[in-house]
Amino acid sequence: MNGNQKLDAYNQEKQNFIQHFSQIVKVLTEKELGHPEIGDAIARLKEVLEYNALGGKYNRGLTVVQAFQELVEPKKQDAESLQRALTVGWCVELLQAFFLVSDDIMDSSLTRRGQICWYQKPGIGLDAINDALLLEASIYRLLKFYCREQPYYLNLLELFLQSSYQTEIGQTLDLMTAPQGHVDLGRYTEKRYKSIVKYKTAFYSFYLPIAAAMYMAGIDGEKEHANALKILMEMGEFFQVQDDYLDLFGDPSVTGKVGTDIQDNKCSWLVVQCLLRASPQQRQILEENYGQKDPEKVARVKALYEALDLQSAFFKYEEDSYNRLKSLIEQCSAPLPPSIFMELANKIYKRRK
């Protein structure tokens, strides 16, 4: 398959995935929309789903489907099993939506995926907390509806619950490392940064979609999952460093969001690298300006990052990390096809959104 054919196939898969969303909404809402007691709440759920689950890149959800198609022999890929793979892919997207709606409130974010954050919409506000919980609850309703009779049902339930817990522990580390209104640069170490990323991003963004497909394909051995986890945790760190870079140096018209890591006092890759390179005077500039909403102070921090040439440091990191990933995939992917991991790595390498 040449580059254009691959792109066409990917776009077709993406279209199929997006089309399945209407089925997801139907299963979650259709029966109860006219319910005399909870009809209004179900209409709200439908609105929450349609606003918050759509509009992303769908990488996590599509990864489930693509990995399932690679791991399951073609004769076992009937219409029903593909429906289940699409649904589990959407469960990963709903988990992502649950995290993003919550995260945007905690970070006082303004935009997400090129539109105003859900909680910022008139009449929504902190009711969005309950909406986020509805998104999470929808995952388990879908898994029960589509997968209850499957041998992997319990493994999927445990995987989603574990993914939520890991991510929430990561978010706790993130919030504790950077409490609002209190800047302590001593907390921003590489060790703490790696811990936050491992728990907050890598597990649900990379291991969850691949592990879900593995369970659906009947691959449930500890060794296979441990090897996949090793590769995917490394990939998750690579992805988060990119995210931190794009938060400040990305183009909001491409990324779909306006970054706030400096204002939010975040333990981001950029601030960790800045501290490793800064002179005492430069550290003082960071002390005086980091973690504050004033646009002039934010601009001073950005100027400091530019003076330390953190953009070049990022490009070097991206190259080194990609090469490290390739060797790790060669060493650890068996018995899974290396292509599963390489396709994922190539999808995020040099991404700009």
UniProtKB/Swiss-Prot annotation:
Control of this protein's activity: Inactivated by interferon-induced RSAD2. This inactivation may result of disruption of lipid rafts at the plasma membrane, and thus have an antiviral effect since many enveloped viruses need lipid rafts to bud efficiently out of the cell.
Cofactor binding mode and count: Binds 2 Mg(2+) ions per subunit.
Binding-site residues for dimethylallyl diphosphate, renumbered to this chain: 112, 200-201, 240, 257, 266
Required cofactor(s): Mg(2+)
Annotated positions binding Mg(2+) 2: 103, 107
Localization per record: Cytoplasm
Site (Important for determining product chain length): 98-99
Gene Ontology cellular-component terms listed: cytosol; mitochondrion; nucleoplasm
Binding residues for Mg(2+) 1: 103, 107
Stored CDD domains: Trans_IPPS_HT (cd00685)
Keywords for the protein's UniProt record, in alphabetical order: Acetylation, Cholesterol biosynthesis, Cholesterol metabolism, Cytoplasm, Hydroxylation, Isoprene biosynthesis, Lipid biosynthesis, Lipid metabolism, Magnesium, Metal-binding, Steroid biosynthesis, Steroid metabolism, Sterol biosynthesis, Sterol metabolism, Transferase
Domain of life assignment: Eukaryota
Quaternary state and interactors: Homodimer. Interacts with RSAD2.
PANTHER family: FARNESYL PYROPHOSPHATE SYNTHASE, FARNESYL-PYROPHOSPHATE SYNTHETASE
Record's protein name: Farnesyl pyrophosphate synthase
Species, as recorded: Mus musculus
